[in-house]
């Protein structure tokens, strides 16, 4: 009788371990999101994997100034003059090299490119032959609108 109990206990312990193993295997991969932060007199909208150092892009402003710095964390991106597009809007802007291997440019929040980015969630920065695309999926476009409102001075 003891061998049967031992086998039953081993089987039950094995069954209890299986859901944890399945759960560990079915965890979603790191997911890119947009997060809005306000601290120290600035507003930052970051395209990131939460709780990591992984960034694709950030927008940063001082509330009410009507300008934002767009930083791109694309190792292929280069400094120089860029064509920035969103929807049917386009503009030429200077892209500067910045610390940490990123590049950045300044966007006017009343420019048609920013308005089209807020409306459609897609923006492209093309420097020479290289293109960096910034996307805010529909679930994050509310944060993009909120960023624009805070930075333009609307409350």
Regions found by a protein language model. Give the residues of each.
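Short, exposed beta-strand/loop patches in secreted or surface proteins that constitute
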Residues: 32-38, 59-61, 84-86, 93-98, ...
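Bacterial N-terminal signal peptides that target proteins for export
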Residues: 1-8, 17-18
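Extended low-complexity, serine/threonine- and proline-enriched intrinsically disordered segments
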Residues: 73-74, 78-90
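Internal interaction segment
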Residues: 88-155
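An ectodomain-focused feature that recognizes extracytoplasmic/extracellular
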Residues: 23-78
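C-terminal segment of classical bacterial N-terminal signal peptides
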Residues: 13-21
């Amino acid at each position: 009788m003891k061998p049967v109990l031992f086998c039953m206990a081993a089987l039950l312990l094995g069954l209890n371990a299986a859901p944890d193993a399945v759960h560990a295997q079915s965890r979603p991969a790191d997911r890119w999101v947009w997060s809005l932060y306000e601290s120290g007199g600035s507003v930052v909208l970051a395209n990131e994997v939460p709780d990591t150092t992984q960034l694709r892009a950030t927008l940063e402003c001082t509330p009410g100034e009507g300008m934002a710095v767009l930083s791109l964390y694309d190792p292929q991106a280069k400094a120089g003059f860029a064509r920035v597009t969103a929807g049917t809007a386009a503009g030429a802007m200077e892209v500067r090299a910045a610390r940490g291997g990123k590049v950045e440019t300044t966007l006017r929040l009343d420019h048609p490119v920013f308005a089209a980015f807020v409306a459609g969630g897609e923006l492209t920065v093309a420097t020479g032959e290289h293109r960096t695309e910034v996307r805010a999926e529909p679930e994050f476009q509310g944060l993009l609108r909120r960023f624009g409102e805070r930075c333009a001075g609307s409350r």
